[in-house]
Amino acid sequence: MGVKENNLVSFLVQLVLLTVLISIIELFSYLILIIAESPSEKAYKSFPEFISTKPAPFNNVDDFKEVELSYSNKASRCRGKIIYNDQIGFPRYEKDNFKCYGEELRNGVRHTTDQPSNFSRRILIFGGSTVWGSGSSDRNTIPSMIQKKINENTNKKIKVINYGFTTVTINQQLNLLKNIKIDNHDIVIFYDGGNDIFQSMINENPDGSIIGYNQSNKFNIFIQNIKFFLSNTSNTYKLMSVVKSKFNQNELQNCNNQDKEKSNALISDGFEHYISKIKQVNEYVIKNNATFIHFLQPSLFYKDNQYSDYEKKLIEISPLGINECKIYQERVMDGYKYFSNNYKNSLKDLNSNNLINTLDPVRTREEYFIDNLHVTSAGNKVITEEIYMVLKKTLN
């Protein structure tokens, strides 16, 4: 046998031994995870796994199976790639049309159910993934529920259109609005705040975009994607995550950027930027002979109402979702509080509505949030009622 053959055999033997070793470690980790698993709670959960356990917010909804599938890898492949349209300044799916596990895209926008074929007026709703409807099927998004509410309570032919999209801030919403022809008597609704606070407090750039930040930090995002992949495929990685969480006891890390003055400046500047954009939208809509209504969305980052035990646990599991530095958690919580407390006084001459305290599970005995910002259709139903109460004054 020649040198090349010997080297090949040696390489194959080492490869087999490495594969066997990895398999043994994976099996050992799997057994430890099984032993550590209690009847009520797994030792480790990825977000899709968390959804698959059917947490409390899905108790009284009719679209759980569709939502569960929407968080699967199959659904992600079905939807395809998100690209950024630099000319407009707004992201979009590479596909213009798809139908994927309860989510249907038609001509670039998510399908709103029960739309009339003939209509005399439109309601255009802009926002991030909470308007798009992450956590609900097409029929249970906020725009679809508003459409159904209008159909049931008025004899007017009004068409509701869902212009929500994941990660967008008020900057991108305004960009998109300016690229859509507004008709006389249209009603334009902006429902936002969460992504704007995140962009200002975490990415420290209120004028930027979350997708733009991701594109500028591709290496960090690549590492996060690897971690996400391992969290779904490797028992060893899951076990390491469990061990780490036991040592940290879910405490936030004290990073080296505990600059309170900087945080206060980011909060103040972020709020001023947000308010100025809302006013710009209002001026633009009025100039086009339409009506503008703004809503500050609820979140778990801050509210005046008492938190339920479920909400406390949810915050504990994932303080921010991507960054565990204590300063970032404090910024977002303080930022949301600052936005909420100063929102109404800063927009006195505008139809502005603070929905921070809309979702109150302690009072209603029903849960809504599946993470710090997103809700199930149970939450969408409550939010729809609040929006419709404001909207019907304009419709009458």
Spans of model-derived segments:
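Conserved SGNH/GDSL esterase-like catalytic core that processes O-acyl groups on lipids
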Residues: 88-104, 122-124, 130-232, 242
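N-terminal Sec-pathway targeting helices
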Residues: 2-21
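Serine-dependent acyl-ester chemistry module
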Residues: 195-344, 363-366
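Histidine-centered active-site loop/cap adjacent to the catalytic His
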Residues: 11-14, 29, 274, 343-352, ...
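Membrane/wall-proximal cationic-aromatic binding patches
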Residues: 39-132, 136-139, 143-149, 363-364
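Membrane-interface motif at the C-terminal end of an N-terminal transmembrane signal
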Residues: 22-40
